Regions:
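Nucleotide-state-sensitive switch-loop elements of NTP-binding domains
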Residues: 2-9, 14, 18-138
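A short, aliphatic-rich alpha-helical micro-motif
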Residues: 83, 143-144
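Conserved small/polar residues in nucleotide/adenosyl-binding loops
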Residues: 146-148
Length: 148
């Protein structure tokens, strides 16, 4: 049975890790695997995930939209081989990621068959106008392409 993927995106400090923590805290018995990407050498976001366990996989020192895309696909393949298999895979992107590139990578036919991308959730800090961000065009596109 396919395992749906929820892709959580958003700019730096928008609250992505808070959203992932909320999902994990309210899993109600569902097996949720979380893949957390942090651009830095130390994955601070993975350390902040409440109750971080073997259900949380850290990908750091690069971005899953480009330099770590192969690592992401390998990680997903490993998660799908676990017994018991997760019921949902949540991927938290780094704040500098271009989600369009990640979506393209997740459309790999082998991955898609076993773990289709179900939802792209873009977390936005409503107190920070998008126009004030250094990469306003990218962030506007990110918001526009999200399902939620």
């Amino acid at each position: 049975m396919p395992v749906p993927i929820l892709l959580v995106t958003g700019f730096l400090g928008a609250g992505k890790t808070t959203v992932v923590n909320h999902l994990l805290a309210h899993a109600e018995g569902r097996r949720i695997a979380a893949v957390v990407n942090d651009f830095g050498a130390i994955n601070i976001d993975a350390e902040l995930i409440a109750g971080a366990s073997d259900g949380v996989v850290s990908l750091s020192n690069g971005c899953i939209c480009c330099s770590l895309e192969g690592d992401l696909l390998r990680t997903l393949a490993l998660l799908l081989r676990r017994d018991p298999q997760p019921e949902v895979i949540v991927i938290e992107t780094s704040g500098v990621a271009d989600p369009l590139d990640i979506v393209r990578n997740l459309m790999d036919p082998i991955i898609w068959r076993e773990a289709p991308l179900e939802t792209v959730l873009c977390v936005v800090d409503a107190t920070v106008p998008v126009a004030m961000l250094d990469d306003a065009l990218l962030r506007s596109q990110e918001i526009g392409r999200a399902h939620v």
